Amino acid sequence: IGVAKAGAKNVICIVGDGSFMSNMQELAVIKEHNLPIKIIVLNNKGYLSIKNTQGKFYDGRIYGVNKATGVWFPDMEEVASVFKIKAGRAWSIKTLDKYVEMAMKQIAPYLLDCVCTEDQIIMPAQTFKKGQQAPLHDMFPFLSDEELQQEMVVSL
């Protein structure tokens, strides 16, 4: 929102549906100021990062991450409609280009709901390394120690 308010012509926000659920109230600000923000929602119908973490650390027991485990997510096009923001839905990679092109032509806010698989493995991911919890800057798949040091902006 800040980048758009500063005058950027097209701002693209790529967000998962779970994260979007925590911030959808910002659509009111986007609409009120008619900000040219394109919101691309990667929709896997749940909290996929949490689901992957639970599956990894809790012997496959999954709770509160999707409809099957007690959490319902609204239709993203309907959410956009409530805020009077135009929206579209890409059901497959074959239709994605068409909808991205349509979104980018809009001078007003636009929400693109991209339907994704519900079983995607999320990477990079925080995990254990050498028997200890790896720090946030060192996620799986791991870089070599040399490459990690080279990519860091601060010394390790």
Roles of regions detected by a PLM:
Residues 1-156:
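Thiamine diphosphate
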